Curated annotation (Swiss-Prot):
One of its GO terms (molecular function) is ATP binding. It comes from Streptomyces sp. (strain CL190). This is Phosphomevalonate kinase. Its EC number is 2.7.4.2. Its cofactor is Mg(2+). Catalyzes the phosphorylation of (R)-mevalonate 5-phosphate (MVAP) to (R)-mevalonate 5-diphosphate (MVAPP). Functions in the mevalonate (MVA) pathway leading to isopentenyl diphosphate (IPP), a key precursor for the biosynthesis of isoprenoid compounds. PANTHER family: PHOSPHOMEVALONATE KINASE, PTHR31814. It is an enzyme of class 2 (transferase). InterPro entries: GHMP_kinase_C_dom (IPR013750), GHMP_kinase_C_sf (IPR036554), GHMP_kinase_N_dom (IPR006204), Phosphomevalonate_kinase (IPR035102), Pmev_kinase_bact (IPR005917), Ribosomal_Su5_D2-typ_SF (IPR020568), Ribsml_uS5_D2-typ_fold_subgr (IPR014721). It catalyses: (R)-5-phosphomevalonate + ATP = (R)-5-diphosphomevalonate + ADP. The lineage of its organism: Bacteria, Bacillati, Actinomycetota, Actinomycetes, Kitasatosporales. SUPFAM superfamilies: GHMP Kinase, C-terminal domain (SSF55060), Ribosomal protein S5 domain 2-like (SSF54211).
Length: 374
């Protein structure tokens, strides 16, 4: 008689930045994000008998084959050297998430059992990323699935914190806003923690104590959706790298300059005003703040020359403005997606905007806010 195989499945939604990009990477600066109804799914099961010497087997619908890993000094090492560098690069966020959950288990006197993990993504199409936060979503889903598989009962905040630690180990410059949107779902106001502080704390006192400690700068709260506005999303077909754009900005002398200070102050005021508009149901003020956010990103682009606004993103914004809406790049810009807020009752205007987008080479994405996170 054989026992049934244990299987845990977790789904994490993608995200879009509504306002606060670039400024949010500094701890305590606010941003608004919304989770969207395309998900990444992570399935964790007991290891098959034929996995051989592998402790963990990871497969993804974005990768060519399953890759076996084994534990060595708390880290996962590729079993087959031929898979090495490519596998670690392609699966970096999944691996870091498993390792971070493993650290927590180790501190509690447990270990990660042998398992197989598979990733299925609707944040891509034909291998192309839409820019909906796939790295964040897969990290959040992996943390949740592996933790549940190992019997860890974690609060929503603890799942976010584990995902933040896993992500910061790979790149401490990322704000974690994508992780928060995937974790809580809906519309959120977000402030990033000091990643250098929390990484150092985890190395000094361990993951378990770090989960319970105060995190300077960090805040998340749910927001109501706009009352009479619909969120429209357009994809430029031009993939952008948030990490490289943010890194480029970090390398420039702009950081710490008077221009940088003005950008952060104006963006912070804009985001706080937009939060107030959402909480009071003031759609007119919200549209005004989205326009301000676009203008501030345009000023940053003019001063620093990052390439935030591509011709397609500019056309996307102009089409929405022409019917009285408000639009801007979502996230780091340079490609990927733009968002527009339009009168939800003006169906002809919405159709007109979508048609203008298509003429400009922008693909309207059939997305709606995901009300629940993972």
């Amino acid at each position: 008689m054989t026992t049934g195989q244990r299987t845990i499945v977790r789904h994490a939604p993608g995200k879009l930045f509504v306002a606060g990009e670039y400024a949010v990477v500094d701890p305590g600066n606010p941003a608004i994000l919304v989770a969207v109804d395309r998900h990444i799914s992570v399935t964790v099961s007991d290891a098959d008998a034929d996995t051989g010497a592998a402790d963990v087997v990871i497969s993804s619908d974005l990768g060519p084959q399953a890759v076996g890993w084994r534990w060595h000094d708390g880290r996962l090492v590729v079993r087959d050297p031929d898979d090495g560098q490519q596998a670690r690069s392609a699966l970096a966020h999944v691996v870091s998430a498993i390792e971070t959950v493993g650290r927590l288990l180790g501190e509690r006197g447990q270990k990660v059992p042998a398992l197989t993990l598979s990733v299925s993504s609707r944040l891509h199409e034909d291998g192309r990323k839409f820019g909906l936060g796939s790295s964040g979503a897969v990290t959040v889903a992996t943390v949740a699935a592996v933790a549940a598989f190992c019997g860890l009962e974690l609060s929503t905040d603890e799942r976010f914190r584990l995902a933040m630690l896993a992500t910061a180990e790979l790149d401490p410059k990322g704000s974690g806003g994508d992780l928060a949107a995937s974790t809580w779902g809906g519309w959120i106001a977000y402030q990033a923690p000091d990643r250098a502080f929390v990484l150092d704390l985890a190395r000094r006192v361990g993951v378990d104590r770090t989960l319970k400690a105060p995190w300077p700068g960090h805040s998340v709260r749910r927001l109501p959706a706009p009352k009479g506005l619909t969120l429209e999303v357009g994809w430029t077909g031009e993939p952008a790298s948030t990490a490289s754009l943010v890194s480029d900005l970090h390398r420039r002398t702009w950081r710490g300059s008077a221009s940088h200070q003005r950008f952060v102050e104006t963006t912070t005021d804009c985001v706080r005003s937009a939060v107030t508009a959402l909480e009071s149901g003031d759609d007119t003020s919200l549209l005004h703040e989205i326009r301000r956010a676009r203008q501030e990103l345009a000023r940053l682009d003019d001063e620093v020359g990052l390439g935030i606004f591509t011709p397609k993103l500019t056309a996307l914004c102009d089409a929405a403005e022409a019917v009285g809406g408000a639009a801007k790049p979502s996230g780091a810009g340079g490609g990927d997606c733009g968002i527009a807020l339009l009168d939800a009752e003006a169906s002809r205007d919405i159709t007109h905007v979508r048609q203008r987008w298509e003429t400009a080479g922008v693909l309207p994405l059939p997305l709606t806010p995901a009300l629940e996170g993972i």
